[in-house]
Regions:
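Conserved alpha-helical substructure of the radical SAM core
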Residues: 1-104
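Short aromatic-enriched loop/helix-cap "lid" or pocket-rim segments at secondary-structure transitions
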Residues: 23-25, 76, 105-106, 129-130, ...
């Protein structure tokens, strides 16, 4: 059985804990209802997920480790070491808000291929502080760094005024279909929204079915209920005092690297 690489970028959610409380977070405040839609995985859970790829001799073009805030996971170092040892991922990425760059976390992050730092209004100075710090110089010399600005959140399921929507148009205009696939113990999703809704899952049953599912360019059944582009709203916090405190702590952590 020859190896096959599944195209696109796949999300692996390893924790439901975060040091920010974003209103409308797609995995921790779904539909602004407080619903948590992602898992909390141990190292053994991650091993079980990756074992399904190994069983079918499948690889991923990119795997993104997500939370919550993944740097808060106590087993993050072991999880990254294990994934890299399996040779099942061509590019290993971690998505973080950049507010927990402790010495131990930074040592772990140097093993990655790519880091995506999400920047929120409360911590918008993080790019400037990070890029001017010794930490920024050190990490960017080893790992590719991207910044994702989160001034606005999509309100999934809500239409923008003045636009036509239908199943095909929603699919064609969707930003999720290649970059926000999800892999978990149950199987694979082609979209983080269907993952949150627990719809359109391809289980770990048959290699060719998995390949056909991921390679398909046919809209999902849920696309008709998911207008794209969705209505947007300005980023807000559900807990301003805690988020401000954690943002200041995170920025100070980065600044301390300039003193080392």
């Amino acid at each position: 059985m020859l190896p096959f690489t599944l195209n696109g970028s796949f999300d692996l959610h390893i924790t439901d804990y975060c040091n920010l409380h974003c209103k409308g977070c797609v995995v921790l405040d779904y539909n602004q209802s407080g619903e948590v839609t992602n898992e909390k995985y141990t190292l053994d859970n991650v091993i079980d997920v990756i074992s399904n790829l190994k069983k079918f001799n499948l690889k991923l073009e990119e795997l993104k480790i997500l939370g919550g805030e993944p740097t808060l996971h106590t087993d993050l170092n072991q999880i990254i070491d294990y994934i890299k040892s399996t040779n099942t991922v061509e590019k290993l990425t971690l998505v973080t808000n950049g507010l927990n760059f402790t010495k131990e976390v930074v040592e772990t992050l140097t093993k990655l291929d790519r880091i995506i730092i999400s920047i929120y209004p409360m911590s918008r100075s993080i790019e400037s502080v990070f890029s001017k710090s010794k930490l920024g110089d050190m990490l960017s010399s080893k790992v590719h760094i991207d910044y994702l600005y989160q001034e606005y959140f999509f309100l999934y399921g809500y239409k923008q005024d003045g636009l036509e929507y239908n199943n095909e148009l929603n699919w064609k205009r969707c930003l999720q279909k290649n970059d926000c696939r999800v892999i978990n113990l149950d199987g694979l999703y082609r979209c983080t929204i269907t993952y949150s809704e627990k719809k359109n899952l391809c289980e770990w049953n048959n290699r060719q079915e998995i390949i056909d599912f991921i390679e398909s360019d046919i809209p999902l059944s849920h696309c008709k209920d998911c207008p794209m582009p969705a209505k947007t709203t300005k980023w807000e916090t559900n807990n301003s005092p805690i988020d401000l405190k954690n943002s200041m702590r995170g920025l100070n952590l980065i600044k301390t690297w300039s003193q080392k």
